[in-house]
Amino acid sequence: MNSADCRIFRISADASLREQRVLRKELFCSLRPGALPVIVDLSSLMGLNHDDIDLLLDCAALASGRDVRLLLVAGSRPNRVLLEITRLSSVLPVFNLLADALDSIARAKTFPAENAFASDPARPRSA
């Protein structure tokens, strides 16, 4: 898998307010209908604050109404727990590692019929 197959956004705790605004704008623009899959990588964060959660909720809402795949990389147990508490893990696929998210995209590209319901919240997730 190469970077041309998806867009990866790494959320950083030390980003300035200006950098956060630019990231938010680029992320929202990437969630246009029919766009490449988007991965939001939270693995560099020790925890999620309210701004991070707001961003993810907004992204989930945008992605749900469009034909675009949005995946999250929790990176840590505390992040995964917060994603479960906010119910984001019930509407978006959540992975522990970036490599796992990239593999999921590669599998969906190789076997599209098998992964047609990969974002269905009713399906159990093994990631």
Identify the residue ranges that each predicted region occupies.
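A charged, well-structured terminal subsegment
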Residues: N96-R123
